[in-house]
Every structure is written in C-alpha cells, then in structure tokens.
C-alpha cells in the first residue's frame, strides 16, 4: 500500500460545475476567512452571540492574515475539484504562515476533530479551536505537523516545489496543487525548484500544479514577480517548461459568486489539460509536456478592511500579519474588527449549536479523499518495511583471511551494491538522490538496475550515460532539491538516501533543522502521525581526502548542527562514522530499518583499509563504541598507559599507525573506536547514551585518552563534559587548516597525522621521559612535508605502511596514483 490509489484519478468532469458547488465554495471561503480571523484574534465568544467586547480579543495578537484569504479561496476550489473528480490529492502550502487556512480547512472537513476529539464541532469546540492558535499550550502559527493533511510546514521558505515533486515520484495517481508565495519565489531553492518538471515522468509519477500566489507584497516590500510585465512573467514560466494560466480577481467590485464561477471554469480547463498529459504519457512518455501552472493574482489581505487608520491595508504589505494590532486596546480598532467579522455573515454559516451548516460542506470530498485524511499526508500509515537483501553477501571478507587492516577498498562502492539490490527488491519505493555526485560518491552500482531519471532531451550515448525517462536515481546540482525531494518521498511513505560532499551539506543545514523540528514535534506530541522512514545522508568526499579540491571543500561542521538536536530524548538525529566498508554496510542496514531519524553517515570514498568483519561492525554499532581488543596490548585498564580512541576513517587510520609505533616502543594502550557519536553524550541528557559505568570501563576511569576525531574537537568536548575522566581527554580534530594537497599534508596541518598522534600520546604519558622521541617525531614531520613539496607525493614511510598483523596480498594494494580516484568514475 506504499502508493495507494484513492478515488478515480485523472478523470475529466462530464458536466459543468454545479451552481450548488459554486455557492458552497463561496460559503466555505466565508467560513474559512471567519475562522482564520477568529484564530488570530479571539479567545472567547467565537460566534459573537453574546455581547461582543474587547475582553473577547486575545491579549497578544499573533499570526498572518495577508496570505490567508487567498489560500482559503484556493482550498475551497481544490476541495471541490477533489470531490467532483474523486482525485487523490495532497496540498502543499508554501506560504505556511497562512496556517489559519490549513487548520480551518481540516476543521471544516472534519479531520481536525477526528484527531483532536476535544475540539468538538460545536460552539465550545470552536472556542477552543480559536483560543489555541499561537497561544500558550496551544498550536503553532504555521501549517505545522499538528495539522492534518500537512506534509510541508512552510516555516523556512523555499522548499514548496521540492516537497511537491518529491511527493509525486513513484506516485502516479497523486495530484499536488502547490501554492507558492510570491515572496517565497524569490528564494534560491524555490527558484531552482521550477526545474523539477524535467526530473519526473507523467506516466510513472503524479502531477504537480504550481500555483503562484501573486498578492504583490512581502512583509514590507513589493515582490519582484508582481512588478514585472505580464509578458515577462508569462515568458519566464514558459522558459521554465510550463504553460502559464493567469487568474485575476479582487481588484474591483465583481460579485464573489462570479469570481468563483470564473475560477471553477479555469480550474476545469487546467485539470482537463493535466488529464490529457496523463493519458498521452501512457503511450508516449518520451516527449516532455509543458505542464500547466497558475498565476493567482489577488490582493494581499483580500476581504479585510481596505483602509485602517487612513492607511491602505487590503492590497498592501500592511495586511501581512495582524492588520488590527490594537483591537483589544482601542475601541476604534475593536469596532473595525467587529464589522470585519460580521461582513462574512456567520449566522448564515453556523447552526445554533455552533456547528457548521451542512450546505457549507456538501460540495466537499468524503472519507480518505479529504485533504486532512489522505494517507499520503500521513506517510507512516502506508509505509512498508524495505525488503532488504542479506547483508553478508556484500561483506569485505578479505579481512577474515588476511587480517585486520587488510586491503584498499572504497567503502561507498559496497554501499552502492547494497543500494542496487534494494532498488531491485523495492522498485517503486526506494530512491537515490544526488547533487551530481552519485558516481563521485561511489554509488554507481545502482545503474546496473536503474537509471537517472531525466526528461529533458538526449544527445549521443557517448555522453548521455545511464539516463532514462524513468529511474530510481535523481540528480540535480542542488542540495536543497535533493534534501527536499527525499523529505517528501519519505513523508509520503517511501524510503531513500542521498549523498553529498561533506562541506556542501552545510548548504542544507537549515533544511535538516526544519525537518528535525518536524520529527521532534511528531515524536513528542502527535501520536496519530505514524513513523516515517529516516532521512539517510551519506556524507562523503570529506575533509581529510578532498583530493581534487581544496580549502573551500573542507568543512565537517554539519556534525555540530546535528548535535544541537540531542538534548530532549527525542532521538531524531544520529551521527555515524564508518571506519571501513563493513562498518558502512552495518550502518546502512540499521538506517534503512530506522524511522523518524536524520542519519548522517560519514564515510570516505578513497581506497582504505578494512579493519573489522561485518559481525564485529554490527556488535560495535549496537554498542556505539568498542575496544578493538585485537589492536590493544594492555590486558586491563590498570595496565593502560594511554587510551587511543578514534571516530572516522582517516582518524582511525592514523591512530592505528600511531598504535603500531607505540607498540614497538613498549607503550601499553587500548584502542577504542567510536561509530555512534551521540552515544558519548552524558546519559543524564540522553537516555540512549552509554552509562557512566560503561563509559569509564571503555575509556578508563583515570588514564589519559587521546581521541582523534573526524570533525571539530569541540563536538566531543561538549558531549563528554559531564563524563567520568573527561579532564583526561585530549581531542584532536579538524583545525580549519587545509588546501589542495597530499593526504599526509592534510592530516599534518591539523596535527592529526600518526607522528603527531604518537608524539602527543608520549607527551600525555611522560613528556620529560620521551622528550627526545617527541622531538624526533616532530623533525620527521618536517622531513615528510618537505618530501611532499619536493616530489608532489607523500613519503613512502607514510604511504607504504600496513598494519603489522596483515598478511600482505599484493593484489589488494593500490599505487599512490590509483589511491586518489576521480570524481566521476
């Protein structure tokens, strides 16, 4: 049921829109506008039955009116279209600050009361409904996860089209009217979102109808698209691959019923064109259509007072938030509010008991076709577990035969093979997204069973590889689009992963933050939202091996962003460091089974050793961290002189090389590897973290700990501040030093190289005793750097090192040239 077919999608209407429906839509618009104002302004007396006084007005007036009446108008017509066509539909509200429209909609269609039975369909329930909006102990101001029917909060603007198109992928019956605010249209992500129509197929995917809500103003400025000429505006959308329609209303004295008739007729014309596109695609999906889009030009704050305090309000930026900010404090503003609310004639819309009259809702859809009840907008309801192949078949087994530390393997290639077979087993519910980096990040085994979906013309097979009009891989050079597509794909019940160069995950820091907030709200207080599949993000081409790029591409700091989400036991973020290919496989298996998470998986793509077996990886992953007993030489914590800890593939490599040298000196140590970073956090802050007892047993209670960490050192310092023995931790991480240089030089400039780590370990044990050795190591670092400067490659003592337990198999070793692989093969 992952892609449920609801109703009878893509059927044209064989009759005109009825006059009863026209009248019903006008009543809906009036009642929704009234309820939207009530949510912003009223705390009591919701129908103004009792003497209406300033005491009925909230003390703090919070919310946004400007976009709301236009949204209410559109929702009336979308509801009518769903009912008349029995069309499976999810609604995207780009200007999510029009939240009163979304909550009013779900109250009117009945789903709000079904999910929140205390909000009854009577006057008492209406009062609670009004009072709770943007109120202490109440609900947020936006189209938040608390609202039935929402998959897009619209808080941070820019992602409406990304979410709309992600929702329709592999969902051929789904129609997504996507409202885009004309202010939102100025954001970067939205600007590139128009190109999404080249990445879907009308045969195998659904249809998005972009609706530009062109009300002319933002918070305090006009919008760009509202001020360009009609010709330029229409040419812009034609250039984006759309067939633009335009509807204009609200700027004269046209009767509202006439406006509804005009819009209903236009909406039918547009939907007929969509049905024709769907029908044609069944026999020809190679010709990309020009999809319809709608420019909806109406006044900002439509139907509010035209002037307040002598200043133009309707049709201006002054209508953006709360037009009557002093409605409680001044009689003049209160009287204007009263007249405004009375203008909707609530007595014609509500029964005596406060319930909404039947003739207001008669035209609306029923059952799961209701916007608030559509299972696609509560994806956990329809989510099915992935059919995962057995992981053992992808294991790098050479480590068993040749020893820990064997080989030179590009870890993500194993993940690519795993994803290939997941797609094979789940051909319409698993996707891979990438910003032109799927091959670069070594996931190209997926092309053995699928293609990159691309509906934008083809040239010679000499240059257009692995491309087709259908496929489970989607690439666009936009991290925003990749994250947005995946989020919506998950929110509508499916599964997936996307990969990015580590430094450029920062492009979508705030998107991760927004999605985390959605998940946090869900797991805390919205039990009716069923768990969705996790955002899985492969973070590769990382700071330590950005071989083809330089300082601009070296920033592992997304770890710090995600760590800010770990303090309330919501458990919506995970940070995993894959030591090698087998660990990456174990992590992927766990992530693909998980729900309601953001899983950031750090794994380098360059050839590297395989340190542990798959069984060892699974055991370590379960614990979050583990001692590598085969690498330790201390028999007990009492015997330990220093703990050598690492998180990340390159830090692990350098710690292991340092341990080899320290072992030859007779130093007693234990080696600890950390895969699940958040398990280090104080168990007082995180009830899934390891206990203090386990922490002390792993890292010792009183011995020095040298921790080589993939990202910024303060991450670890912040996590362990309340842990036993934290004062004895020395954390070495990325120090904001780098360039396009050799692997040794990259770790050298950040004091992460094996020689610096060996010297630091000796310093922690007894700086005076080992002063000569420390000096010798520092001098060798200079020699090794000079070798790289003179020759352009690293010194053999660095590149040729192999862990001593390895039975060297020459066929597993790569030359220095091969060990720096390209970005696109």
Curated annotation (Swiss-Prot):
PROSITE patterns in alphabetical order: PHOSPHOKETOLASE_1 (PS60002), PHOSPHOKETOLASE_2 (PS60003)
Entry keyword annotation includes Lyase: yes
Listed cofactors: thiamine diphosphate
A Gene Ontology BP annotation from the UniProt entry: carbohydrate metabolic process
The keyword Lyase is annotated on this UniProt entry: yes
EC number in record: 4.1.2.-
Alphabetical keyword list: Lyase, Thiamine pyrophosphate
Disulfide bonds: none
Catalytic EC class: lyase
Family recorded in the similarity comment: Belongs to the XFP family.
The protein's name in its UniProt record: Probable phosphoketolase
